[in-house]
Amino acid sequence: MSNKNQRKTKSKDREVRKTNDSSILSKASVEKCGYPGFTVGHSYYQPFIQKSPRRSPSVNRGYWTRCMAIRFAVYQFLKNKTGKRKAIVNLGAGYDPLAFQLLSSHEYNTDDVVFYDVDYPETIENRVQMIRSDSFLSSIVLEDKEFDLDGTEIHTKNYHSFGCNLNLLNQLESCLEKYGIDYCNDAILFISEVAAVYMPRQASEKLIRWMSKFPDAHSCFFEQIAPATFDHPFANVMVKHFKEWGTPLHGLYAYPTIESLKSRWVKNGWEYVEILDVCTFWNFLMDSKLKHLCEMVEPFDEWEEFYFFLQHYSIQHASSKLVGKYDLVESPDPCMQYIRYVKSEIIFNNSPLTLRNSIYSLKRTDLPACLKELPSLRLPAVCDLDDSVIVQGGLSTAGRSKDAYLISEKDDGSIMKITTDSLTSCMGQSVVSIDKKTCMFIGGRESPKKILSSCIYFADGNWSDFPSLPYASHRASSVSIKHNGSSYVVLLAGKPFGGCLIWSDSKRKWNTLKCKDPLFYSRWGACLHWSSKLKKGILCGGMNELNEPVREVLEWEMVLRDDDHFEIVTRVLNFDVQVEILLSRIGSKVVFFGDDSKPIIVGGAAVFRTILWEEESVCINMNDYSVTGVCIEETEKRPVFTMFGISGMGNHLQIFGGGCICFSFGSCLNENATFYKLVSA
């Protein structure tokens, strides 16, 4: 290799090592916050860092889930009773203390397990110095004092840490054998936690092929994926982030989906393969007690962003031979994004639905000049009035907003600021139109800890306070209903307490609305619609009180009982499971154009799999419950349909604000407004 190429390679290696530093800081934040599964008292991360910044709740939860996913995969390997000695080889270990956490764990007996941490020689030398300088970590592995005399490596009975470039497979094989691995008789687990993904395609394939030649080898690779193409806003920001760091994700470009990752392992010699996204791990494999404890650590409401993160990472497990193989997923569920391959045959593959296109399509139109003064907001409240749209609250780049804007639909449009002192700087409030000139703003939150119960009326251009809810509410869903000439508002109260409430416009008070179905009253972030034409409604998406996805789609009606009180009566609609998956979203919005028996569901964050662009907008025909796609014109910069407000006026669909923070990679914020025109497909 020329001197120029050597310098280039060393420069790339340094950039990859920087990602290790960032990862350890984030995991240290998880530990410091007290997330479950991280020992209180002794820090496993502090010896490797000079500072301990606190990350955002979204980043903390993401890294905690990543750690739990790796541990889950390792535990399945340790539980697999083969009678053999086990070896766990962490390829690109960096400063990760996984081996120390497992060696000091009382959950599993690691007496017959030997750990090998492998990385660049410079990284390992620093790692060894840090371990030796910390009495807690050194006490775990250095009790027998059998370490390398020159101080650059550690070699003890059950732990080895040594430097080796993963491209030098002959050297790696020789070192592992030298330090005790018996390739013929040991069960070996190779871990790569966002490490091999930085290797060029040919190099990573050589590594995987080399691993497969051992008779009882297994893998746990944790890597990025792009399930909805690289044009998806989250994937786009993620890829750009790593490229700017000088660490392009070569493995992601070559194998962007779980289907392509399956092929990667199969063609390189593995007889048993399981590939799943981390969303599947979170929804189906993560211990529910751990998730409950996680909720108690710090306030959290970034669910859309969290699900984007979960759906853009994969867990790859493979066994070189069927003899000795074990499962990560024992009983596959149709909602899982999961593939299982067993020697020449795909046993489980959850293929997405192919939507039939609707008679509608949405064509991008120019934004009225007057809207340039409207800020870009996340989670604003948006409501249609007779010939205008009102936008209130939300989160701007300057913080939470209390401002309200009245946007006229007449002529070329106009915008007027109509903020009043009674409004609160908040986001996530529910808003419902009572009639053509009246709407109600309900609840919302100032922060994840400060939830509101206020109700504010806007009628004929004037604001007024109304009786508050019986309890605080945000992430709620609401609809207006007419019955015998009277107006009512039905509210699914959302977080934090749930339940159903009903507002009578004539009595001007809230009451509990009776409903016996927890699939209805316990949801938050759901899409609620009422058809005045059919005198029935539909409910889809959302999460329950345990923050678990609800996939059942309900039809609901309002029944007036003898005691002059309404009751919600529901039935589960018999949709194909792939339709249920498609409609399982949080934060989606509903509009209709003329015929309210054909609501259009727009956007939201899917809770089982990433929504493809052609699936962002779907029409549910409540007459026969057929579901069709509504094609949205794709532009160079795709908006992200989460945390937005929506208006459907005439034949125009108007998206206000929206966007998301893309984990620790950056943000993707929409323009202040995006307009579409409904046309025949």
Swiss-Prot record:
Pfam families from the UniProt entry: LCM
Compositionally biased residues, Basic residues: 1-11
Catalytic activity: 7-[(3S)-3-amino-3-carboxypropyl]wyosine(37) in tRNA(Phe) + S-adenosyl-L-methionine = 7-[(3S)-(3-amino-3-methoxycarbonyl)propyl]wyosine(37) in tRNA(Phe) + S-adenosyl-L-homocysteine; 7-[(3S)-(3-amino-3-methoxycarbonyl)propyl]wyosine(37) in tRNA(Phe) + S-adenosyl-L-methionine + CO2 = wybutosine(37) in tRNA(Phe) + S-adenosyl-L-homocysteine + 2 H(+)
UniProt feature coiled coil, ranges: none
UniProt KW keywords: Methyltransferase, S-adenosyl-L-methionine, Transferase, tRNA processing
Pathway: tRNA modification; wybutosine-tRNA(Phe) biosynthesis
Residues spanning the signal sequence: none
Keyword tRNA processing: yes
Region called Disordered, residue ranges: 1-21
SUPFAM superfamilies for this protein: Galactose oxidase, central domain, S-adenosyl-L-methionine-dependent methyltransferases
Keyword rRNA-binding part of the UniProt annotation: no
GO cellular component term, pick one: cytosol
Class of this enzyme: transferase
EC number(s) per entry: 2.1.1.290, 2.3.1.231
Residue sites binding S-adenosyl-L-methionine per the record: 66, 92, 119, 165-166, 193
Biological process according to GO: tRNA methylation; wybutosine biosynthetic process
InterPro entries (alphabetical): Gal_Oxase/kelch_b-propeller, Kelch-typ_b-propeller, Ppm1/Ppm2/Tcmp, SAM-dependent_MTases_sf
A GO term, aspect molecular function: tRNA methyltransferase activity
Function of the molecule: Probable S-adenosyl-L-methionine-dependent methyltransferase that acts as a component of the wybutosine biosynthesis pathway. Wybutosine is a hyper modified guanosine with a tricyclic base found at the 3'-position adjacent to the anticodon of eukaryotic phenylalanine tRNA. May methylate the carboxyl group of leucine residues to form alpha-leucine ester residues.
Family affiliation: Belongs to the methyltransferase superfamily. LCMT family.
PANTHER family according to UniProt: TRNA WYBUTOSINE-SYNTHESIZING PROTEIN 4 (PTHR46529:SF1)
Name by which UniProt lists this protein: tRNA wybutosine-synthesizing protein 4
